[in-house]
From Swiss-Prot:
Protein name, as recorded: Glutaminyl-peptide cyclotransferase
Glycosylation sites: N42, N156
Record: residues binding Zn(2+): D131, E171, H297
Biological source species: Drosophila melanogaster (Fruit fly)
Compartments where located: Secreted
Active site: E170, D218
Annotated alpha-D-mannopyranose binding sites: R85, E91, Q151, R155, L306
EC numbers, comma separated: 2.3.2.5
Pfam families per record: Peptidase_M28
Length: 340
């Protein structure tokens, strides 16, 4: 990913998911209802935290693990495989992994991250713990800890489904450019934009237009991360994360006293897997730590330098956010910059 310099003005908040005052007081009950499963999280992270450059054996193993995990969690799983020429290696096979609950739903909440690790010719052992093994583990662990809700009350809803997207080929093989980056998300966005579903497919919206918001996780796992709002149209969703964190902290459900989610709009953007979706007018909630962790793209981005209290805190806030979004969803949410 890369930091850009696009500046925009915030026109106000879309307070879609802010907990009402009585619910703020009982946030601890929500936090207790959906308990941590650290055994699952640690096992998941261990399975992903290996060198996984596109085309490597480790990459293939992690891909298979993601498919197996999604199937085991009750998702309908699809592998979006394609070949493309890249710098250094020539032609490689990429594979996005997508899991869906309620695939026939009108709209979707999409949670995403990338699973490939960066290629360093002088560091074949680079594992990219924050970039993005931990985000992968967070998505699977969120599905696991919310499993009782997702597999019973939520299943077969027609208004909203849940997508977990594990992008391949986010990392540049040489230097970050529009061409040498986000290979998987470009392919998947184009595929979703070209297809429609339903018995009257010609009249149906494009599949990409059924995504209400793409929530993209990246660079998570270091000590005391900070998350700002990047896009005006999803600032209300970011504000809900701020409020959930505050409520859980008040209820004694979080560790330490460092706030992760900041009530501020960033003056710059971070280029990442969301770019092709943003180009297709998909609302994006970009949860990337800024400033970047000091271990970013160094050999120190490994398990030894992860900060477990920060990871647990993020997991708890994010789990509640996902649950509240799905639980309170009653009608389509259109946050697009222009209407479709």
């Amino acid at each position: 990913m890369a930091i850009g310099s696009v500046v925009f003005a915030a026109a106000g908040l879309l307070l879609l998911l802010l907990p009402p005052s009585h619910q703020q007081a009982t946030a601890g009950n929500i936090g207790s209802q959906w308990r941590d499963d650290e055994v699952h999280f640690n096992r998941t992270l261990d399975s992903i935290l290996v060198p996984r450059v596109v085309g490597s054996r480790g990459h293939q193993q992690v891909r298979e693990y993601l498919v197996q995990s999604l199937n085991g969690l009750g998702f309908q799983t699809e592998v979006d495989e394609f070949k493309q020429r890249v710098p250094v290696f020539g032609e490689l096979t990429f594979a996005n992994v997508v899991g869906t609950i309620n695939p026939q739903a009108q709209n979707f909440l999409a949670l995403a991250c990338h699973y490939d690790s960066k290629y360093f010719p002088n560091d074949p052992g680079f594992v990219g713990a924050t970039d993005s093994a931990v985000p992968c583990a967070i998505l699977l662990n969120t599905a696991k800890t919310l499993g009782a809700y997702l597999q019973k009350e939520f299943r077969n809803r027609s208004d909203v489904g849940l997508m977990l997207i594990f992008f391949d080929g986010e990392e540049a093989f040489k230097e970050w450019t529009d061409a040498d980056s986000v290979y998987g998300s470009k392919h998947l966005a184009a595929k979703l934009a070209s297809k429609r579903s339903g018995s009257q497919a010609q009249l149906a919206p494009r599949n990409i237009d059924r995504i209400e918001v793409l929530v993209l996780l990246d660079l998570i796992g270091a000590r005391n991360p900070k998350f700002s709002s990047f896009y005006e149209n999803t600032d209300g969703l970011h504000s809900s994360l701020v409020q959930i964190e505050k409520s859980l902290r008040t209820a004694g459900q979080l560790e330490g006293n460092n706030n992760m989610f900041l009530s501020r709009v960033s003056g710059g953007l971070v280029d990442d897997d969301h770019r092709p979706f943003l180009d297709e007018n998909v609302p994006v909630l970009h949860l990337v730590a800024t400033p970047f962790p000091d271990v970013w793209h160094t050999p120190r981005d490994n398990a030894a330098n992860l900060h477990w209290p920060s990871i647990r805190n993020f997991n708890r806030v994010f789990r509640n956010f996902v649950y509240q979004y799905l639980k309170r969803h009653t009608s389509p949410v259109n946050l697009r910059f222009y209407r479709t």
